[in-house]
A protein has these predicted regions:
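Short, contiguous alpha-helical
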Residues: 33-37, 44, 55-101, 137-174
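Acidic/histidine-rich alpha-helical segments that form the ligand environment
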Residues: 102-152
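Cleaved targeting-peptide boundary
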Residues: 9-20
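Second-shell loop/turn segments in exported
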Residues: 22, 26-34, 57-63, 104-116, ...
Length: 174
């Protein structure tokens, strides 16, 4: 091996391996649930705050192929329910269906009112939390992370909608 010496000596040192602060499934679950709570709070803040006159009408550049704020929020809710279902065991899914508590995707995606959107978004995140708590299997982490990434991606879209209209999103006010 060639000695790098001098200012590059650090490059030859073995990296220090540090233990992850997540030492158990419980720690991982808690960390994921915290991230889900964070994006839920931001999504609900927008669902409650986005101006009524733009809520289900504004589309960037008037493009009919682009979702309105209401449609984005309902899409987040529908996907949350879908992935909450995938986080559950088959037995848990069957019990949910039998109880009549599994909502229909078409019903979730139907715009009724701003308040209805807020209720659906909140309920969908509650379904995700419940699914994780009922089945905290770390093998399901891809679904957990999908909820976080998907919701955050659409949160970014919604922030852009605020900015496009000369408004400040609730998460940027202080």
């Amino acid at each position: 091996m060639v000695s790098l010496g001098g200012e590059f000596a650090w490059a030859q040192q073995s990296p220090t391996v540090t233990k992850s602060p997540l030492t158990s499934t419980s720690d991982l679950t808690i960390a994921v649930l915290k991230e889900i709570q964070d994006i839920e709070e931001r999504a609900v803040a927008i669902a409650e705050d986005f101006p009524d006159n733009l809520y289900n009408s504004y589309r960037p550049k008037g493009d009919q192929d682009v979702r309105t704020a209401a449609e984005i929020l309902l899409h987040i809710a529908e996907q949350n329910y879908s992935y909450a279902s995938l986080m559950r065991t088959k037995q848990q899914q069957e019990a949910l269906i039998a109880s009549g508590k599994k909502p229909d995707a078409k019903d979730i995606l139907t715009f009724v009112s701003k308040q209805d959107v807020v209720v659906k978004v909140k309920a969908s995140f509650a379904a995700v939390r419940e699914a994780i708590q009922d089945n905290p299997d770390p093998k399901k982490i891809e679904w957990w992370l999908y909820v976080i990434a998907h919701s955050n991606g659409h949160f970014g879209n919604l922030v852009t909608y605020y900015r496009d209209n000369g408004l400040v999103p609730p998460t940027s006010r202080q």
